[in-house]
Amino acid sequence: MQPIQIAIVALVVAIIIAIVVWSIVIIEYRKILRQRKIDRLIDRLIERAEDSGNESEGEISALAEMGVEMGHHAPWDVDDL
């Protein structure tokens, strides 16, 4: 192979690797943004529960839409034997 062909192949391989890496970065960034949104909703739920004594149904349904389950957070404290 001539040096120009090697350079072209190396450039194509580098572009493919860059696309894969940036795709992974974008996927992880979306996960982080989703987690921040979930954390904000949970914080608002906790704050409203402390203020009013009950939880907001709208925010619970928003969390349910994202697939987040509110419930038992201490797996070592289970009384369902």
UniProtKB/Swiss-Prot annotation:
One of its GO terms (molecular function) is CD4 receptor binding. It is found in: Host membrane. It comes from Human immunodeficiency virus type 1 group M subtype B (isolate LW123) (HIV-1). One of its GO terms (biological process) is symbiont-mediated-mediated suppression of host tetherin activity. Ion channel activity is inhibited by hexamethylene amiloride in vitro. Phosphorylated by host CK2. This phosphorylation is necessary for interaction with human BTRC and degradation of CD4. Belongs to the HIV-1 VPU protein family. The N-terminus and transmembrane domains are required for self-oligomerization and proper virion budding, whereas the cytoplasmic domain is required for CD4 degradation. The cytoplasmic domain is composed of 2 amphipathic alpha helix that form a U-shape. The chain crosses the membrane at residues 7-27. Enhances virion budding by targeting host CD4 and Tetherin/BST2 to proteasome degradation. Degradation of CD4 prevents any unwanted premature interactions between viral Env and its host receptor CD4 in the endoplasmic reticulum. Degradation of antiretroviral protein Tetherin/BST2 is important for virion budding, as BST2 tethers new viral particles to the host cell membrane. Mechanistically, Vpu bridges either CD4 or BST2 to BTRC, a substrate recognition subunit of the Skp1/Cullin/F-box protein E3 ubiquitin ligase, induces their ubiquitination and subsequent proteasomal degradation. It is a single-pass type I membrane protein. HAMAP family: HIV_VPU. This is Protein Vpu. Keywords: AIDS, Apoptosis, Host membrane, Host-virus interaction, Inhibition of host innate immune response by virus, Inhibition of host tetherin by virus, Ion channel, Ion transport, Membrane, Phosphoprotein, Transmembrane, Transmembrane helix, Transport, Viral immunoevasion. The modification Phosphoserine is found at S52, S56.
